[in-house]
């Protein structure tokens, strides 16, 4: 279960990639703007400020996140973004830190590019840190007993969850889009006693928490702390540097030449 409060513990850090993504979306006006994977809606509200005349459509797979978004006044619905289809007046589609949960997201991007009208925009940001020490530590601990038998059904993501940026660039160029694709590694300066643990508790550890009872969950966290501390040692000033790679995809539909 996704916990909006835990997720928002690092809201400022998590928000920066969203704004970096939107800065490259060139739609001056929009009739309908869609946020797929809207989370608790704290960033969706910006879409209404950026395009004040647009209808804002929002969707998330988590009922808890949708409830939090509705509390912020967002007209959000619970649903699977794989089943979403654009309405004829959709001018901007945004998906921030959500599509990496969908193994077939490349197919989705191509489908959207084919369904949206020329001149529409797609903006996507996905984490690209699945080989990072934090994920490696979680996988290593999950292979140990007593956790292995409890967590063996979790498809811990490893390898090419998110493709290299050139994959998305070539794919969307071939589909006739004008593309702007890049990657950035943010060096987050975190504070607190166990900041990396608290960060991943709101994301990577969600499926682990769902399968462990309270006692096993607390034990798992306690055993994970030294692994994360070794991987991300705190500085003398008390801060912890947490590198986080992200991949950005911006495409203007029908503005390029499709491959022959």
UniProtKB/Swiss-Prot annotation:
It holds the Pfam family Methyltransf_23. PANTHER family: TRANS-ACONITATE 2-METHYLTRANSFERASE, TRANS-ACONITATE 2-METHYLTRANSFERASE-RELATED. CDD domains: AdoMet_MTases. Its EC number is 2.1.1.144. Catalyzes the S-adenosylmethionine monomethyl esterification of trans-aconitate. It catalyses: trans-aconitate + S-adenosyl-L-methionine = (E)-3-(methoxycarbonyl)pent-2-enedioate + S-adenosyl-L-homocysteine. It is an enzyme of class 2 (transferase). It is found in: Cytoplasm. Its main location: cytoplasm. The lineage of its organism: Bacteria, Bacillati, Actinomycetota, Actinomycetes, Mycobacteriales. One of its GO terms (biological process) is methylation. One of its GO terms (molecular function) is trans-aconitate 2-methyltransferase activity. This is Trans-aconitate 2-methyltransferase. One of its GO terms (cellular component) is cytoplasm. Keywords: Cytoplasm, Methyltransferase, S-adenosyl-L-methionine, Transferase. Belongs to the methyltransferase superfamily. Tam family. It comes from Mycobacterium avium (strain 104).
């Amino acid at each position: 279960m996704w916990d909006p409060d835990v997720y928002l513990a690092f809201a400022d850090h998590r928000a920066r990639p969203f704004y970096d993504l939107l800065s490259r979306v060139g739609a001056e006006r929009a009739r309908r703007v869609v946020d797929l994977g809207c989370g608790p809606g704290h960033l969706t509200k910006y879409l209404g400020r950026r395009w004040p005349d647009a209808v804002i459509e929002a969707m998330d797979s988590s009922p808890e996140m949708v409830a939090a978004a509705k509390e912020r006044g967002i007209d959000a619905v619970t649903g699977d973004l794989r089943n979403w289809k654009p309405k004829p007046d959709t001018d901007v589609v945004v998906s921030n830190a959500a599509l990496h949960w969908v193994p077939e997201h490349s197919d989705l991007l191509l489908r959207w590019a084919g369904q949206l009208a020329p001149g529409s925009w797609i903006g996507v940001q996905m984490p690209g840190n699945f080989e990072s020490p934090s994920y490696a530590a979680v996988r290593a601990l999950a292979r140990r007993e007593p956790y292995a038998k409890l967590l063996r059904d979790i498809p811990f993501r490893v390898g090419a969850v998110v493709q290299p940026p050139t994959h998305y660039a070539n794919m969307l160029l071939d589909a006739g889009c004008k593309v702007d694709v890049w990657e950035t590694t943010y060096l987050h300066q975190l504070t607190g006693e166990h900041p990396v643990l608290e960060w991943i508790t709101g994301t990577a550890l969600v499926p682990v928490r769902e399968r462990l009872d309270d006692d096993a969950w607390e034990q798992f966290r306690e055993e994970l702390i030294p692994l994360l501390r070794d991987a991300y040692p705190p500085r003398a000033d008390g801060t912890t540097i947490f590198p986080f790679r992200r991949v950005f995809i911006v495409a203007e539909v029908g503005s390029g030449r499709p491959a022959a």
